[in-house]
Amino acid sequence: MPKASDIKKGSAIEHNGKVYFVKEITKLTPSGRAGATLFRMRMYDVATGSKADESFKTDEIITLADFSRRSATFSYVDGNEYVFMDSEDYTPYTFNKEAIEEELLFISEDTQGIQILIVDGVPVAIELPSAVDLEIVDTAPSIKGASASARTKPATMTTGLTVQVPEYIANGEKVKINTTEHKFMSRA
C-alpha cells in the first residue's frame, strides 16, 4: 500500500469509509527539528461531490481505490453540464461545469487524448493529455524579426485560457500548450 508521499494528483483513494478523488496536493514542511512533513490533500467525495481537505503524515499508509480510465472525446454542452462520449462504446459521461472548470480551459471540440476516470461505475474526473493544440483568438500583432529575441506576450485561446507566447505568434495560429504547467510549447 502506498504512503501519503506516493499519492499523486488525480488518484482515487479510500479514506474514512468513503472514496475520494484527489484534486490537489500541497506539501507542508514545518520549521523546526521535530516537525514532520505533511501532505495536505484537497479531495472530492465520489458519491456526493462534496469537498474535503485532509492532512496526512509522510509515512501514513493510504488505500488506493479501484478505478478505471476510459478514452473519450468532448461531445456537447447541455446547460451547465458537459457531455463526453466514450471513444469505444459511445457511453455518455456527464460532468457539472464547476467540477471540471480548470480542465475546460484546455478542452476544445477537437481535443484528443482525454481520459475519463471511473470509480464504482461513476465518472469522477477528466484526465487531460500532457499537451493540447489550441487556437489563438486575441494577442498583440506579431513583430517581424522577433524570432531572434526571447520576449513574450499574452495570448488568449478559444477556450478562454491565457498564456505567454513568443512575440512572432499571431492571431488565428494553433499552438501546443502544456496542460500541467499552462505554458506555450510550440506551434501546432
Curated annotation (Swiss-Prot):
Top-rank taxon, per record: Bacteria
Entries under InterPro entries matching the protein: Elong-fact-P_C, NA-bd_OB-fold, Rib_uL2_dom2, Transl_elong_fac_P/YeiP, Transl_elong_KOW-like, Transl_elong_p-like_YeiP, Transl_elong_P/YeiP_cen, Transl_elong_P/YeiP_CS
Protein name: Elongation factor P-like protein
Any single Gene Ontology cellular-component annotation: cytoplasm
Organism per entry: Aliivibrio salmonicida (strain LFI1238)
One family name in Pfam for this protein: EFP_N
Cited SUPFAM superfamilies: Nucleic acid-binding proteins (SSF50249), Translation proteins SH3-like domain (SSF50104)
PROSITE patterns: EFP
Disulfide-bonded cysteines: none
Record family assignment: Belongs to the elongation factor P family.
GO process terms (BP): peptide biosynthetic process
NCBIfam families listed in its UniProt record: PRK00529.1, PRK04542.1, yeiP
Single GO term (MF): translation elongation factor activity
